């Protein structure tokens, strides 16, 4: 699987970079997690800092166009992203019990 970055837009207010990318693949559309790991390796980031939002493969084509958000830290991703998107990308969500325990310590 080969990842090519098409565009990068810096969003300093939300501590992230929005990336559009293209993937060339031989078999079926790769999973969201394998795309996330490949993209993270390409841009030298931790996979918890990358949230893949969209993967679009045209019928019969062996390339996929995607959209991802790359955050400065995993904490920034947890603060900004919605829970369902974090679950799709297998990023751990901090529960309220953990937050209140951390505040009380």
UniProtKB/Swiss-Prot annotation:
Cellular component GO terms held in the UniProt record: ribonucleoprotein complex; ribosome
Record-linked InterPro entries: Nucleotide-bd_a/b_plait_sf (IPR012677), Ribosomal_eS24 (IPR001976), Ribosomal_eS24_CS (IPR018098), Ribosomal_uL23/eL15/eS24_sf (IPR012678)
Keywords: Ribonucleoprotein, Ribosomal protein
Keyword hit for Repeat: no
Superkingdom as given in the UniProt entry: Archaea
UniProt xrefs under PROSITE patterns: RIBOSOMAL_S24E
Molecular function, one GO term: structural constituent of ribosome
GO BP terms, alphabetized: translation
HAMAP family associated with the record: Ribosomal_eS24 (MF_00545)
Family under the similarity heading: Belongs to the eukaryotic ribosomal protein eS24 family.
Protein name per Swiss-Prot or TrEMBL: Small ribosomal subunit protein eS24
Source species of the chain: Haloquadratum walsbyi (strain DSM 16790 / HBSQ001)
Lineage: Archaea, Methanobacteriati, Methanobacteriota, Stenosarchaea group, Halobacteria
Gene that this polypeptide is encoded by: rps24e
């Amino acid at each position: 699987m080969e990842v090519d970055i098409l565009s990068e837009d810096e969003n300093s207010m939300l501590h992230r970079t929005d990336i559009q990318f293209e993937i060339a693949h031989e078999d079926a559309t790769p999973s969201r997690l394998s795309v996330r790991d490949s993209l993270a390796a390409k841009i030298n980031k931790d996979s918890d800092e990358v949230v893949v939002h969209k993967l679009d493969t045209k019928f019969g084509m062996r390339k996929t166009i995607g959209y991802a958000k790359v955050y400065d830290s995993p904490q920034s991703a947890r603060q900004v992203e919605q829970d369902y998107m974090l679950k799709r990308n297998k990023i751990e969500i901090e529960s309220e019990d953990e937050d209140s325990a951390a505040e009380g310590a």
